[in-house]
Regions:
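Signature aromatic-anchored transmembrane alpha helix within multi-pass, membrane-resident enzymes
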Residues: 2-41, 47
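Extracytoplasmic
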Residues: 36-210
Length: 210
């Protein structure tokens, strides 16, 4: 009697198992479908100001966003205003000097958002893409950017700017956080070498006089 029932019982058990797996699959698929809807919005609220709303303007967040570097908080609005000025008033693709920072920071933000070339962008990207070149190429450039903003010698800094054919020097909140005031004051103190061409509440852009 048991042997006669065994195949039917096995089929019943198989159907139960199949239904259980199907239910599990439906639950998993439902969770996967819901996650992007719920998680994306939560992530967006965590990282961006919700007041910006939905937009195709990739720079809109800067109107209200505040950023933290080395424990200091600053608004991104002045950088956005300066970027817009550069886009509207600068012709061609002149090289602009700006702060160089470790990865995942606000460094190279002017070059990134305007398309203007800078001395050095994201260090690791440059290292990867230039593997066949001398290993210290990127570190030398990083040191030169550091010197532009730290060195108080006008002649030495002008030499570095000439080497990279830099036409504009950018001084904003990020530069004031990463570099000493003595190194930044030389730009304002030598208008015959660095002519201020733009200024707002947090940014000054200097044109290199040649």
């Amino acid at each position: 009697h048991w042997l006669a029932r065994a195949p039917g019982e096995q089929r019943g058990a198989a159907r139960i198992a199949a239904r259980a797996w199907a239910a599990a699959f439906v639950a998993l698929a439902t969770a996967c479908a819901i996650y992007p809807v719920v998680a994306t919005r939560a992530r967006w609220r965590d990282r961006f100001d919700a007041a910006t709303g939905f937009t195709l303007d990739g720079q809109a967040y800067m109107k209200t966003a505040r950023h933290v570097e080395l424990g200091q908080t600053f608004a991104l609005g002045p950088d956005l205003e300066a970027m817009r000025w550069l886009e509207q008033h600068i012709e061609g693709t002149p090289v602009i000097a700006e702060a160089h920072t470790p990865e995942y920071r606000w460094g190279a933000r002017i070059s990134t958002n305007t398309g203007l070339p800078t001395i050095l962008g994201w260090s690791w990207h440059q290292t990867q893409q230039r593997a066949s070149l001398p290993a210290d190429l990127v570190t030398r450039r990083a040191a030169d950017v550091d010197a532009i903003y730290r060195d108080v010698s006008v002649d030495r800094v002008l030499g570095i700017l000439d080497r990279y054919r830099v036409d504009y020097v950018y001084v904003g909140a990020l530069e004031r956080i990463f570099y000493p005031s003595a190194g930044l004051e030389k730009f304002a103190g030598n208008p015959d070498r660095w002519q201020p061409v733009y200024r707002n509440a947090g940014v000054t852009i200097y044109r290199v006089v040649r």
